[in-house]
Amino acid sequence: MESIGIVAPQTMHFAEPLRLQSGSVIGNYQLVVETYGELNAARSNAVLVCHALNASHHVAGIYADDPRSTGWWDNMVGPGKPLDTNRFFVIGVNNLGSCFGSTGPMSDDPSTGQPYGARFPVVTVEDWVHAQARVADAFGIDRFAAVMGGSLGGMQALAWSLMYPDRVAHCIDIASTPKLSAQNIAFNEVARSAILSDPDFHGGNYYAHGVKPKRGLRVARMIGHITYLSDDDMAEKFGRALRRADGALDAYNFSFDVEFEVESYLRYQGDKFADYFDANTYLLITRALDYFDPAKAFDGNLTAALAHTQAKYLIASFSTDWRFAPARSREIVKALLDNKRTVSYAEIDAPHGHDAFLLDDARYHNLIRAYYERIANEVGA
């Protein structure tokens, strides 16, 4: 199926200060966005795609100067794809605090002329949603046909349906959770500790020292990456295979160098991530994950938290996802059904763990395609 082709990001500037959940204020900030497809005359066919931890506004297509720069959800978004850009106008927004062009720790603080670094305020999922709403306003979009996301993106989609109930017709929440478990918070803490203890971190102001805390960021990514894969998937991909340049496949080196294929894979993923991602951004986004808990203001009652929602919902989970297990999605489904909301739920039998939401699985894509067909009929797309 064809890609959407060459795309280009655009930078949107916002002069009105944004008050954050922490009480801090971000003034004169920018957000980088990409759009795909055409907004119809009624402005009724817009879909917002929210990104997960290490992704960005670059949802689909490629950049003219880099043919390898395929968007992170290119198999999902494009002409004739499950989210069909021949029918829908799709927006991807790079969130505040990120390192891909939107205002974040790498940006210059207007008050000092130096990068914010550790001074950049902690942001939350709710802060991102408020910022995204301003993007919608700038496009003249009063109501999204759908807000969609996987993992952390799914949390944003759910938050949209809570915070702007009259602006979301459909919420598509994939491989997500209503809040992080203690185990998930613990994984994030270990990852952050790896970064914070890196000698090159310099209290978050490493830009001024001309270094990056790559060692810590590398370990953080390795920890995270393990949680994105299933045990079965790792067994099939790597098993206990040894990595040997000399062809001696059955002998140990009796050292702490790379011995197993899975070690080599994790080191490769860690090195690649540390080259392009920012450590301060990693700290911010993992903390935003930790803080997301819409039921907190309702004494932990998710049903009460979702009482004022108006959207229709598609909730999807994957059988081997142990980071955000299907049981967590079913918590959302139950709370919505308790509120007599219209909910479709699917647990997809897929071997790939949490990362399955990013992959091209026929059953998964057929589900999303069928749901968008329903939305298209509603909005005349």
From Swiss-Prot:
Its EC number is 2.3.1.46. Substrate binds at R221, D355. One of its GO terms (cellular component) is cytoplasm. GO terms for molecular function: homoserine O-acetyltransferase activity; homoserine O-succinyltransferase activity. Disulfide bonds: none annotated. GO terms for biological process: homoserine metabolic process; methionine biosynthetic process. Homodimer. Transfers a succinyl group from succinyl-CoA to L-homoserine, forming succinyl-L-homoserine. This is Homoserine O-succinyltransferase.
